[in-house]
A protein has these predicted regions:
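Active-site hotspot residues in diverse enzymes, especially metal/ion-binding acidic/histidine motifs
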Residues: 2-415
Length: 415
């Protein structure tokens, strides 16, 4: 079947001779070069994913020259080669050769996610999840309702604080965050029209990422609950990525971008959006005044606020100082105060500098995608191998997952 697909792809682009009357008289020296449709398609997908030839070769497990020769039409990939290449690009062979909605590479905010340029494996994982999400919605005939609001502004350069606050407040009011709580941030984003799921990642620099494919808005969050690490960072990352989707649609492009242009500003604006979204001004000021938190030392006041808003200590510090409820402290002095209260000597990570961390199990990682896959499996609409493909796990792991679905856990039985 793959050989047939290759023949179809090669036939997509035929050479046309300008002078129809001299079709049989064309000189050999001026004959058009052989078409290279498959190589062009590989190159197009690679460039759209912002991969270098070397990066793609590394993911496929071949030499750089092999990929170069494929793209130049000097050699032709066989069926097995295409399986590995399409997998490395995060698409199916059919998508690679014939196009369609699923073949359109997702658009990442590369300027806002600099580590993506170095770790292309993450973008491939994201693309596979996007394709799986689109497929399971089609199988279940269940499309995510609601469309994420965007806010247009004519201003050039940095966004005004008032504009960022307005956007965050508007979305917060329609999100149900107040009732659901930030621990259920995945459900909150899905309620706003953003497909959300969790991924596992051992590297540094990526806590979450946002991407767009067609009309689909998508956020992937690092599964810190499974790692037993600070989930406050996951919550803030989710709101931060929402900020990029809402405030910076121009970042999500497949075109070449300036490496560092305005990246710090965009990150600062997304951080400001996240702070306003998670800790709204009116509610923060009300609690601060009603509970007379100004009477406390800053450390104790922030601990009390954390019991209200369930976000990170440092997010609350930024909000309190932004709103001039307390004066800003020199970072070194503030960190030393935290260390003193926590009994920490020597260097410390940001996770270690978080007083009273939320328990990892408090984060709800169940999401719409996993529920749809489970529902399809229980209805025998998909098999174990498809579950493995969609979850990007081994077949043996998928068997364990589907077995657990059939035999749910029960609570303790009283004697």
């Amino acid at each position: 079947m793959l050989k047939t697909e290759l023949r179809k792809a090669k036939a997509l682009k035929k050479t046309q001779i300008k002078n129809e009357g001299e079709r049989t008289m064309v000189k050999k020296a001026t004959a058009p070069a052989p078409t290279n449709e498959v190589g062009n398609l590989i190159r197009k997908q690679r460039e759209a994913m912002h991969m270098t030839v070397t990066q793609l070769a590394g993911l496929v497990g071949v030499s750089r020259n092999t990929i170069t020769n494929y793209e130049a039409g000097k050699t032709e990939p066989n069926s097995s080669d295409l399986v590995h290449i399409s997998g490395a690009l995060g698409c199916s062979i059919n998508d690679l050769l014939h196009g369609g909605i699923a073949s359109i590479p997702p658009r990442f905010a590369f300027r806002a996610h600099a580590p993506l340029r170095k770790d292309q494996a993450i973008t491939v994982v994201a693309r596979k999840y996007l394709r799986a999400y689109d497929e399971i919605e089609e199988i279940m005939n269940s499309r995510l309702s609601g469309t994420l609001l965007t806010f247009n502004t004519d201003q050039e350069g940095p966004l005004k604080d008032e504009f960022i606050k307005m956007a965050a407040d508007t979305l917060r009011k329609s999100s149900g965050l107040h009732d659901s709580g930030p621990e259920n941030i995945a459900s909150v984003l899905e309620g706003l029209g953003v497909r959300t799921l969790f991924f596992e990642h051992d590297g540094k620099g990526i806590e979450g990422l946002s991407t767009i494919q067609g009309d689909m808005k998508f956020v992937m969050l690092r599964n810190r609950r499974k790692e037993g690490k600070l989930i406050e960072r996951t919550i803030f990352s989710a709101a931060h990525e929402l900020g990029h989707l809402v405030l910076h649609p121009q970042l999500f492009t497949s075109e070449d971008l300036d490496e560092e242009k305005d990246s710090k500003r965009h990150e600062a604006e997304a951080d400001k959006f996240a702070g306003n979204f998670l800790v709204p001004e009116d509610e923060l000021v009300r609690v601060w005044v009603e509970e007379r938190l100004s009477k406390h030392k800053l450390f104790d006041a922030l601990i009390l606020l954390k019991r209200v808003f369930h976000v990170s200590f440092h997010c609350l510090y930024r909000r309190v100082t932004e709103l001039h409820l307390h004066h800003s402290l020199d970072r070194a002095i503030f960190v030393n105060q935290i260390k003193e209260r926590l009994g920490i000597n020597g260097p410390a990570t940001m996770d270690q500098l978080e007083p009273d961390p939320l328990p990892p199990d408090a984060l709800y990682t169940t999401n719409r995608f996993s529920r749809l896959v489970r529902s399809a499996s229980l209805q025998d609409l998909i098999g174990v191998s498809k579950v493995a493909e969609m979850f990007q796990v081994t077949v043996n792991r998928a068997k364990e997952i589907t077995t657990d679905w059939v035999t749910p856990k029960i609570g303790p039985i009283e004697a």
